[in-house]
Amino acid sequence: MPNSIFQSCHQKDLKSLFSSAYKDIGAQKKQIKQRFQDIVHEISAAFLSRKYSIDKILLTYNKYIDPLLRCSCPTFDSISVIAVGGYGRKERTLYSDIDLLFLAQNDQLLNNQRLFEYIDVLQSLPVRIGYCTHNFDSLITYANNDVHLLTALIDARFICGSDAGMVYLKKILHNKKNLPCFHDFFIRKCQEQKARDYKYPMSGVPDIKNTVGNLRYLHTLYWLFKFMFPKNTINRVLQQKYISQPEFNRLKNAHCLFSEIRFYLYIYYQRQENRLLLDGQQAVINFFSADSGRPIESFMYRYHKTTQEVSRINYAIIARLANSVNLPKP
């Protein structure tokens, strides 16, 4: 992969840059914004070259965003900075939100001027910074009442600061103590999927993230399996026959296709845009069809067939899971 930018983004170099500018918040904002834009430019060029898989593109992109957050972060002895959501999964695309959890043992530790300044610096990035702050007790309380927060925690990944919060979070996710049981989590995620289907129906302008049979259908299965088996997820679900190897392979291929389309849309619009708008459809078709040498109709047929396959497999797996917890088929 082209590395002219990435070589300049090693953590050691960034640490030196930010430590010298630390007292000047304005300079720090300028530096982190420029570094971010450099990385976006370079990873976009790498994607457009069609030399690398989308998995490698996403992993590399997130790999080089992490040091920006670490090196612009002051030393926190008692606050954990944790990536959640798509950023936690290392699937964050170009202009997607950067979602963070700031976790400490109590609220007094979170009432920290350096934390406020750090958040202010991050908000200078040309993407939305979604964040929440919690102490250990409030995290459990909110996770029990908010399925969106609970789901985001499944994707949690340590970035910097104190590791105590991450150790605590891993422990509660593993033993499920004081968290909803799988039965309740399963019902909530099925209800969430139905509500999303109603909000984003099939249309001539599909949403790559939310429309029926697209990325969220894949994410829902991932979250259900990850909640059930925090460790060795894929091996366990294959062994338990919740999913077959051919089904898994189809879902993996679908994830690659949807992620590629989504990544290209973000480049094309230079913003967060998950909808296949009419002008975007033509651009996507031209880009992917030119590479494959296939006619335009072939690409769209592949896309729609893939959404149908994902829907079918999603429904089949949810039915199997429902049976395992003695629930009627949703």
Can you say where each PLM-predicted feature lies in the sequence?
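N-terminal regions immediately upstream of nucleotidyltransferase
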Residues: 1-77, 95, 199
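Glycine-rich, histidine-containing beta strand-loop boundary motifs that form or position
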Residues: 83-85, 96, 102-105, 126, ...
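Conserved catalytic core of two-metal-ion nucleotidyltransferases
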Residues: 63-66, 70, 112-167, 188, ...
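Helix-loop-helix transmembrane hairpins and adjacent membrane-interface loops
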Residues: 74, 106-108, 116, 170-173, ...
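Extended catalytic-interface subdomain
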Residues: 163-180
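Active-site nucleotide-donor binding segment shared across nucleotidyl transfer reactions
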Residues: 56, 65-112
